[in-house]
């Protein structure tokens, strides 16, 4: 059954032609602003990695990667879910220094994604990573970086409204409100994690929810996180209130990455200490990889947010079930 729902009073602010123009402008302007704010250089990234490299992102630990055999190598490869671990490896290989980082155009297939207004099996995002020092592994440093990203988003929105006056009603809150997952649970103890996100983002406009992955006092986790890239005490999601949909839109998942102590602790907590024997994990535990922070910023989601679109299929080409197509057609929503 389709989870797609188009609001009754929704209407597209831009036609197909201007939507394509705007998407190109957003991707150019935002990447420039992001690179300037975080001191990033664009690099070329892989679409797939070897199965046994340990470089793929396990996400919540249950999603199955798209896998295929490579006869000339006598190996199997898998399409990346994200580049969270590859980026850290690349920073070491390319000789980036503290304060410097990289950004890639990441394209992925997430075959097990449940389709709705915000989710597609095709994922496109800016995957970024930068080298930091031990003294940078703090919540204030994380928050400073979040503010830089939010400022880049809002400045892109400002330029877009100048080019497309039809978007004048789309306004974003430039100052993010920070809250931990435990504080959020304490504030809304009777709501589910997703309901808490919606309630808090509705109230504040732009929010940063920190410390995702570990168990809360209630015994549950706010959301899943793989144990081998983010430090669960130093990570976050950035959410904006999406006026057209009337819900929180998660634009970015990011964080300060695990050091050897945090990785060991989190692998044990997740019940998978054997991962420490994988090549990437061994390099990290042996101190051969730099300390880093990084994240992913959804390209299609940013376009949805800044263009006021009600469905992600209005800004990207993907595959949709018959019911989703029918719901969109009845509402006059044109899927690309």
Where are the regions a protein language model picked out?
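Extracellular structured ligand-interaction cores
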Residues: 100-102, 123-127, 204-206, 246-248
């Amino acid at each position: 059954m389709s989870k797609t729902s188009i609001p009754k009073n929704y209407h597209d602010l831009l036609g197909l032609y201007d939507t394509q123009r705007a998407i190109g402008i957003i991707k150019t302007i935002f990447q420039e602003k992001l690179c300037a704010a975080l001191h990033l250089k664009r690099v070329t990234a892989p679409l797939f990695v070897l199965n046994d490299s340990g470089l793929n992102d396990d996400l919540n630990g249950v999603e199955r990667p798209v896998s295929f055999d490579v006869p000339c190598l006598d190996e199997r490869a898998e399409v990346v879910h994200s580049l969270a671990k590859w980026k850290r490896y690349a920073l070491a290989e390319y000789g980036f220094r503290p304060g410097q980082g990289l950004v890639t155009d990441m394209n992925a297939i997430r075959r097990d994604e449940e389709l709705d207004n915000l989710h597609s099996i095709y994922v496109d995002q800016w995957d970024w990573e930068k080298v930091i020092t031990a003294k940078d592994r703090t919540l204030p440093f994380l928050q400073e970086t979040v503010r830089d990203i939010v400022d880049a988003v809002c400045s892109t929105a400002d330029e877009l409204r100048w080019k497309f006056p039809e978007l004048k009603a789309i306004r974003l809150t430039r100052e993010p409100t920070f809250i931990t997952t435990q504080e959020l649970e304490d504030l809304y103890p009777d709501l589910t994690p997703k309901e808490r996100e919606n309630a808090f983002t509705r109230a504040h406009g732009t929010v940063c929810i920190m410390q995702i992955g570990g168990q809360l006092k209630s015994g549950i986790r706010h959301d899943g996180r793989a144990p081998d890239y983010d430090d669960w005490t130093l990570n976050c999601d950035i959410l904006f209130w999406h006026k057209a949909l009337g819900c929180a839109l998660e634009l970015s998942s990011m964080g300060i990455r695990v050091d050897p102590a945090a990785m060991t602790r989190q692998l044990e907590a997740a019940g998978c200490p054997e991962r420490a024997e994988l090549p990437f994990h061994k390099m990290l535990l042996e101190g051969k990889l730099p300390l880093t922070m990084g994240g992913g910023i959804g390209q299609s989601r940013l376009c949805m947010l800044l263009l006021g679109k009600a469905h992600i299929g209005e800004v990207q080409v993907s595959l949709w079930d018959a019911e989703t197509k029918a719901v969109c057609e009845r509402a006059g929503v044109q899927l690309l």
